[in-house]
Structures are given as structure tokens and as C-alpha cells.
């Protein structure tokens, strides 16, 4: 889904960086991993709780970062410590020792980064999974500085960059609504050209407009709309 990011990760692995992959499937990236945690689909929360448990139990959290930059850590510890790691391992179908080693590797590295795609977010426990990923980064101090962080990857190639730069029908660069007169004035003064005063068509609306002969052309860059969008026959 993200070949450029994947290539960058592979390059770092070839330079000796350790790679942890949580994936039910043995992908090309998983084959390069030092720790491939082949969890059952839908058990991300269980495995992440295991990792948090091992980090806390081995006192590998960043005490200074936790004290200065987080809240509610005492309650967090109580919640993590009450987890039954053996039961979590059984539910996820993973090797407890492998998860422990991966957790220690993540916590003890000078810098640790995390990347996840729609396989994490577009599932029943997606929100909880992302929260636990953020918890991992925070308790180890792997956020807010160069070479660390949580990196969510969006669904299509460069959709994040396109949105950041204002390639959206309803927002300009910086995510300001184009229908707002204050934002229109800002954009017009910034770019020296008159800015649109109303939102354009979103993708599903474009299809309807094309059918109604209101849309004369569509410039498609880097996306297969027939495969990507719902109802291929309609598209």
C-alpha cells in the first residue's frame, strides 16, 4: 500500500536497524523483521497490552518523560498490571517470549518509530489499538523529537500530502474551510489569486455529476478508482 515508506524501512533494516512487524501474514516486510509477531486477525489490542506489560514490569519506561509530559500514569500502570499475559498470548495466538523480546527492543532502542496503515484503523478495535500505540510511544519517550513517533499511513498514495497542500474540494492548504469568508481572504492575499468561494465536488459526487453530464473531465493521479471506490459497476 505504501511502497515508498516500505522501501525506506527496508533501507534502515539493511543498515542494521531492528524491525518489529505485527501482521497475521508473512509479507515481504515481515520476512525482513527481527521480530515477526504473527498475531490472529483482530487481536492487536491483546498484543499491544502484552508489550506494555513487559515494558512496565521490566521498568523500561521513561520515568522523566512520563513525569513531565503525561497524566494518569498510576492508573495506567494498574490497568496494565492486571492484564493476564498468558491469556492475552492465547487469545492472540502468539509466542509470549517473542512479544517480550520485541517490547524490550522497542523500549531500549535510542529511537523507536511506529508505522501503521488501514489494517490497524479500519477494524472493530481500531480506535483502542491506536490509543495503545500512542501509549507505547509515550511511556518510552518516543514522541516529540527527531527520529521517533507514531506514523499513521493513510489509505491512498500521498493522500496525506495532498490534503496538507489543499488538494481537497472543501479545504485549502492547512485545512481551512474554503466556504469561510475569512479563509477566502487569507488564501487570496497569500497566493495573489482569487480563491474559490464554495466547496467543490467530492469523489462520489463527481461520479453522479458525470452521469448527469455536469462533469466533463476527470484528472486521475495515482489511483485506480474502479478498484478503490465502492460499486465498481457504477464507477
Residue spans of the language-model regions?
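Cofactor-pocket helix-loop regions in the catalytic cores of large enzyme subunits
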Residues: 1-158, 184-235
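Eukaryote-specific, cytoplasm-facing alpha-helical/coiled-coil scaffolding segments in long proteins
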Residues: 131, 162-165
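Surface-exposed loop and adjacent secondary-structure segments within mature catalytic domains
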Residues: 158, 165-174
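Loop-to-helix "switch" segment enriched in basic
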Residues: 178-183
Amino acid at each position: 500500500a505504501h511502497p515508498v515508506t516500505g522501501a525506506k524501512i527496508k533501507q534502515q533494516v539493511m543498515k542494521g536497524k531492528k524491525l518489529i512487524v505485527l501482521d497475521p501474514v508473512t509479507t515481504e516486510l515481515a520476512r525482513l523483521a527481527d521480530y515477526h509477531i504473527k498475531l490472529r486477525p483482530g487481536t492487536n489490542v491483546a498484543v499491544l497490552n502484552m508489550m506494555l506489560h513487559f515494558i512496565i514490569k521490566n521498568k523500561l519506561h521513561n520515568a522523566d518523560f512520563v513525569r513531565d509530559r503525561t497524566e494518569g500514569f498510576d492508573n495506567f500502570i494498574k490497568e496494565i498490571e492486571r492484564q493476564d499475559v498468558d491469556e492475552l498470548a492465547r487469545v492472540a495466538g502468539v509466542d509470549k517470549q517473542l512479544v517480550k523480546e520485541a517490547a524490550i527492543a522497542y523500549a531500549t532502542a535510542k529511537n523507536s518509530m511506529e508505522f501503521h496503515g488501514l489494517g490497524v484503523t479500519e477494524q472493530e478495535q481500531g480506535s483502542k489499538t491506536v490509543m495503545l500505540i500512542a501509549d507505547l510511544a509515550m511511556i518510552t519517550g518516543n514522541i516529540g523529537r527527531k527520529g521517533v513517533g507514531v506514523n499513521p499511513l493513510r489509505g491512498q498514495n500521498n493522500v496525506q500530502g495532498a490534503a496538507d497542500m489543499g488538494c481537497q474540494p472543501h479545504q485549502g492548504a492547512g485545512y481551512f474551510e474554503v466556504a469561510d469568508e475569512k479563509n477566502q481572504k487569507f488564501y487570496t492575499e497569500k497566493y495573489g489569486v482569487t480563491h474559490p468561494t464554495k466547496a467543490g465536488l467530492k469523489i462520489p459526487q463527481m461520479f453522479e455529476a458525470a452521469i448527469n453530464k455536469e462533469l466533463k473531465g476527470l484528472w486521475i493521479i495515482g489511483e485506480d478508482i474502479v478498484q478503490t471506490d465502492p460499486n465498481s459497476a457504477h464507477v
